[in-house]
Structures are given as structure tokens and as C-alpha cells.
Amino acid sequence: MARANRHHIPGQVWHITHRCHKREFLLKFSKDRRRWQQWLFEAKKRYKLQVLDFAVTSNHIHLLVVDSDKNVVLNSLQLIAGRTAQEFNKRKKRKDAFWDDRYHVTSIRDGRAYTESFMKLQMGF
């Protein structure tokens, strides 16, 4: 089955989730969560990613971002996920996948959906 295309909608708020491969707890140590966070901040600088909120759990991440320009979200997620996985695998001397297939994106269309996503982030879901 073909993958769905990603859409660019200027000003659109997206809730992004990305799970570790096989739901493993690859982000269980604060060192690994901090590295993911550092790559997030690098993406903000490099691509001008607009981050509203984020949460990093032991086996997945959540991001609330604003789509500001074509490929900003795509390039940012490639940088963050790719570098996090490379560093982890190099440090642990492993070659396995770090992330599940693709990150999942949900469009936040109204204030209620935004509030629900924000509350989930704050509660760690």
C-alpha cells in the first residue's frame, strides 16, 4: 500500500507522534531524551521550526508544531529522528531500527482539538 502524501498548509498546527521501533523503551534514559531535545532545538534554529509544545516519553515523542513553510516539518523531523537514532546506535554499538516506520501527524483544526492535544502532552500520553 502506498504511503499517504504529507501536506503543507501554512499556519496549520500539527500534532506529531513518533514511536520507538517495536515500542521499545529506547528513550528511557534522560541522556537520550536530552539528545532528542537538543536536536529539536537545532531544527528550530536551522529550519525555523515553530514548536508550541513537546513531550518525550520512554518510547515515543509528541510535538505540537506550526507549519510555517514547505518542508520545514519534514526536514526538521528527518534531522531530529535521524541524528537521535545515529547517536544512540553508535553509542550502543547497534544497527537496529530506532523509530517505527513513520511519524504520525494529526491536523489540529480548532481550539478544542488543540486543547485536547496540549493536555495529552502535559499528562504524558
Annotate each language-model stretch with its function.
Residues 1-125:
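Short catalytic/metal-binding and nucleic-acid-binding patches
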